[in-house]
Amino acid sequence: MGIRLQSSDSMNNQHQTQQNKYFNVSNQASTRSLWSQQQQQQLLDTKGSASTSKSPMLMANNNVFSIGPYRQRKDAGRVSVLEKYEIIGYIAAGTYGKVYKAKAKETQEEQENSIHTHNQTLGSVSVAGIDGGMASREVENGGDDPLRLDGHGGIAVAPAAGGGLSSAAAHRARSNGAVKALPKKSAFTPFYAIKKFKTEREGVEQLHYTGISQSACREMSLCRELDNKHLTKLVEIFLERKSIYMVSEFAEHDLLQIIHFHSHPEKRLIAPRMLKSIMWQILDGVSYLHQNWILHRDLKPANIMVTVDGCVKIGDLGLARKFYNLVQTLYTGDKVVVTIWYRAPELLLGARHYSPAIDLWAVGCIFAELIGLRPIFKGEEAKMDSKKSVPFQGNQLQRILEVLGTPTHHTWPNIHKYPEYEQLSKFSKYRDNLSVWYHSSGGRDKAALSLLYSLLKYDPITRIDAIDALEHEYFTNNDPPVSSDVFEGLSYKYPPRRIHTSDNDIMNVGANKNKSGFNHHPPQQQTVNNNGVTNSSIGGLGVNRRILAAAAAAAAAVQVNGTNIVSGSSSSNGPIRKKKR
């Protein structure tokens, strides 16, 4: 009986196995049929699309390579510099461009927000008690000033339109000395300095756009990365009509203006505390640059700005560059750096490579000029010849020798390694007269003279650096102490920066906006040349349209001249005037 049951079980297993094989085979067959149907459908779709579509383009159209539509779309959405800023006047011009004073234009949304905020401020009062609590009450529309906490446990009062306080609580707060008047928003209008880089050469506009100068690229890239209290802060950059506009914070004064104020019409020395505060802030900014591996290479009084609140800021980074991990010498990139009166002696002797010590020499020259109110080394610059070779600045070196004396191998061990070392033998021997110059200029502080000697050392290796200069006795003796406001304690005010309103060529940007490609629908002008090819089709390949237009105009002028000569020979109106090409 057991044997029979076992055989029946085996028969059942065999039957189940046969069923599984059958189902697997059927599943595979159905999968193959579905796959074949999908392939056939894809082939039919491909044939149908091929029959309905156009023939493939063998050669791409010129518009494929043109960036014109992209540029037009970007230009249409770009905000103009004159749409965002109101130009007040022209400040000055430099080697690389012009600088203008401007202020930001308020948008409609900002005006509505300011009005809403002003109304909210006039409608509430917050009084802070001595125990730190605060009680709020509404003020009636009677000219009362709103009160609020000033963040230090006191009460801040905003002046109302009427002018005075009628609230008894506000009067008591003022009598206790715990009330501070809130400044009006209109009294602190932020101003900006807009630097427009030059795009013309000798006043004549170039036919072909040459691109962005190396100086502009360096200044923009460095200003984007740097962030220090004693460096002018970059706000934004505009690229408009192939011109670059750098918008920076505005400073009302500079050291050149301050020196001129103290030296004209009569000489009045700068206050000792102001002098020390200016020098400390300059060295703090230079220290920040050098710690970030950046050389300024153009430090001078005109590039040292002072804001209305007495903060010194280093500006004009047009010649600045990084000196970390250099591939070639610094001389290879820029053969002439630093204004001649502030140029270090190693540069005058033809150094092919130099260090941050050149900036410290320039700081020493600025320090001496603030003391004596005139440049300490005022030499005459030798101009370059037609071969563009860098001349030896002998007159400037002589001015340095007359004050600091002739350097020796003891004071400057590596002086014989400089290319222009042999030029020193042509000068007379001078002795050190810096202390004589210092006392004759009105200097009395021995620590200041010691710092001046450290900054004006001949040997760049032993010349003091910015970090050590900040720890010098001149700053640490606190007699007088250094102030974050260089104008603190002064009984007089410096005149504001002179602004010229007659020279505002930046205003032409807005006048010619529709002609410069910033309009939403620029007209498509096509000029046919002699070969029958339009400029628009050639322009798609990147050819300058202005060059093509100039060539077409020249060809038309030649044809006109030829007809005038033929017709003029038969007429008796007078001699023929030849037109200049």
Swiss-Prot record:
UniProt keyword Magnesium, yes or no: yes
Biased composition (Polar residues): 48-57
Reaction catalysed by this enzyme: L-seryl-[protein] + ATP = O-phospho-L-seryl-[protein] + ADP + H(+); L-threonyl-[protein] + ATP = O-phospho-L-threonyl-[protein] + ADP + H(+); [DNA-directed RNA polymerase] + ATP = phospho-[DNA-directed RNA polymerase] + ADP + H(+)
A GO cellular-component term linked to this record: mediator complex
Boundaries of every Protein kinase domain copy: 85-475
PROSITE patterns: PROTEIN_KINASE_DOM (PS50011), PROTEIN_KINASE_ST (PS00108)
Enzyme Commission numbers on file: 2.7.11.22, 2.7.11.23
Reported cofactor(s): Mg(2+)
Described purpose of this protein according to its UniProt entry: Component of the SRB8-11 complex. The SRB8-11 complex is a regulatory module of the Mediator complex which is itself involved in regulation of basal and activated RNA polymerase II-dependent transcription. The SRB8-11 complex may be involved in the transcriptional repression of a subset of genes regulated by Mediator. It may inhibit the association of the Mediator complex with RNA polymerase II to form the holoenzyme complex. The SRB8-11 complex phosphorylates the C-terminal domain (CTD) of the largest subunit of RNA polymerase II.
Protein name: Serine/threonine-protein kinase SSN3
